[in-house]
């Protein structure tokens, strides 16, 4: 009987450092990587490329079920590959974002993408980045991590990111947006943002990213006893 590939899930709110942690874990363990937050954007871009009617659930479901996407982490950078093409920047456009929101409203599309996400589970293992990876998508994952940070710290990190890109941003506005999203995500009726009962909860508010990676790796190694990538 073939053993099921192990999964490390990393859930948490926006700005907690999930993406950076997941890329580091994937490179250290040489495992596959799933960025669930990008899945809907990739589907939206595929629909635009193939001129699929995004207002029709029936047209989107088969595209979602057979979405040709993979995620590659190299030197700390995440590449999103759609049908063999790097679309890492293209999926971040406003047009794709709006299209993704429309696609996410269809229950059958969500179900198809849930199955597609689970199909990423292949040997030697998978790092799954999201908000409900440990509670909904991979509830049997042997290693679950919930990465959190105060809303103030997450707003500060986001402000620095935007300033580095040349944007003039208001901290109080960023903080209000993050708190509003937190409230919506944590209190929604379907797949609320909560730690799995068996998850390791890491508060990164006063931690460096190096400390977060070190603790997460140590925890995963203790449970899985797997060698690090040379």
Curated annotation (Swiss-Prot):
CDD domains in the cross-refs: CMPK (cd02020)
Residues that hold ATP according to the record: 12-20
Gene Ontology annotations for the cellular component aspect, listed alphabetically: cytosol
Gene Ontology molecular function, alphabetical: ATP binding; CMP kinase activity; dCMP kinase activity
Top-rank taxon: Bacteria
EC main group: transferase
Record keyword Cytoplasm present: yes
Reaction(s) catalysed by this chain's protein: CMP + ATP = CDP + ADP; dCMP + ATP = dCDP + ADP
Entry keywords, A to Z: ATP-binding, Cytoplasm, Kinase, Nucleotide-binding, Transferase
PANTHER family hit by this protein: CYTIDYLATE KINASE (PTHR21299:SF2), CYTIDYLATE KINASE/PANTOATE-BETA-ALANINE LIGASE (PTHR21299)
Similarity comment text for this entry: Belongs to the cytidylate kinase family. Type 1 subfamily.
Protein name, UniProt field: Cytidylate kinase
